[in-house]
Structures are given as structure tokens and as C-alpha cells.
Swiss-Prot record:
Family listed: Belongs to the universal ribosomal protein uS9 family.
Keyword Ribosomal protein: yes
One function term, GO molecular function aspect: RNA binding
Keyword Ribosomal protein: yes
Xref: InterPro entries: Ribosomal_Su5_D2-typ_SF, Ribosomal_uS9, Ribosomal_uS9_bac/plastid, Ribosomal_uS9_CS, Ribsml_uS5_D2-typ_fold_subgr
Gene Ontology cellular-component terms listed: cytosolic small ribosomal subunit
Gene Ontology biological process terms from the UniProt entry: translation
Coiled-coil regions listed: none
Domain of life assignment: Bacteria
Pfam name, any one: Ribosomal_S9
Keywords: Ribonucleoprotein, Ribosomal protein
Protein name according to UniProt: Small ribosomal subunit protein uS9
């Protein structure tokens, strides 16, 4: 009976093991993740390569013409100091261009952590793994928009 109580003590005092992040790669050597932002949903595949990024079959510089959106897309790769080492293939649907760029960025960051679990702390510190939950506030009845009231007339 003493052996059993000793085992119970060990089981209750043992600290929970830290979650082990294992590399998740498919048969073609790609890591898959989904990214979301506003109404946009991106499906992202990352594999070792030369740094080529395609979005919906086009080069990312052709799909996202504005330099700000191109910069948003590259942020997780630059933060992880892995520019030119990964090929990214993404399909994105829904929302506008800004939301789509944010969704692809979120997906790239998640896929990088699946491909190389050691990058998780760097990307987490940069805030790339957190889903940006801000969405458009709904319109309320009795108002012109979500917060704007109809014009008030004293007389």
C-alpha cells in the first residue's frame, strides 16, 4: 500500500509536460496552414525553396500591387530571418485586398511554425500567430450606421 501512495504523490507533484511542437510536413515536403483576417480565409502551403511566393496562381507582387500589402505578406518570413529559403503557395478568398494580405500573413506564420517549430517563439513575439479578431461592427436599427446617428433637427 505504501508503494501505491508513493506513486500517487509522484503523479500529483509532477509538473505538466511542456507541449512538444512536432514538425508537420506532408508527402511533398510542404506544411499547410489556414490564416484568417476579417472576411478573408487563406490556405497556405510552405516548402523549402528559393523564396517564390504565389497567391491564387499569380506572383504576390502582381496580386497585391500596393507595396504596403506586399510588405505585410513578407513580414513573418523577414522576422524569422528566412527570406529566400521558403516557397509559399497560397489561395485566398473573401474580403478585400487588405484582409486577404493579413490572412495570407497569418497563414504563412502558422505554416512556418509547422515546418520549423523553433521559429514559434520569434513569430509569437512578433504577434504573427495571433488571429486579428477585429471585424466590422454591425449596423444598428434606429441609426444611420453602426454608431452614426441620423441627423438631429431641433425644430
Amino acid at each position: 500500500m505504501a508503494d501505491l501512495s508513493a506513486l500517487k504523490e509522484i503523479a500529483t507533484t509532477a509538473e505538466p509536460a511542456a507541449p512538444v511542437h512536432v514538425k508537420k510536413v506532408d508527402a511533398q515536403g510542404r506544411s499547410y496552414a489556414t490564416g484568417k483576417r476579417k472576411d478573408a480565409v487563406a490556405r497556405v502551403w510552405v516548402k523549402a525553396g528559393s523564396g517564390k511566393i504565389t497567391v491564387n496562381g499569380k506572383p504576390f507582387s502582381a496580386y497585391f500591387a500596393r507595396p504596403v500589402l506586399q510588405m505585410i505578406l513578407q513580414q513573418p518570413i523577414v522576422a524569422a530571418a528566412r527570406d529566400g529559403q521558403f516557397d509559399v503557395d497560397a489561395t485566398v478568398a473573401g474580403g478585400g485586398l487588405s484582409g486577404q494580405a493579413g490572412a495570407v500573413r497569418h497563414g504563412i506564420a502558422k505554416a512556418l511554425t509547422y515546418f520549423e517549430p523553433g521559429l514559434r517563439s520569434v513569430l509569437k513575439r512578433g504577434g504573427f500567430l495571433t488571429r486579428d479578431s477585429r471585424v466590422v461592427e454591425r449596423k444598428k436599427y434606429g441609426r444611420a450606421k453602426a454608431r452614426r446617428s441620423f441627423q438631429f433637427s431641433k425644430r
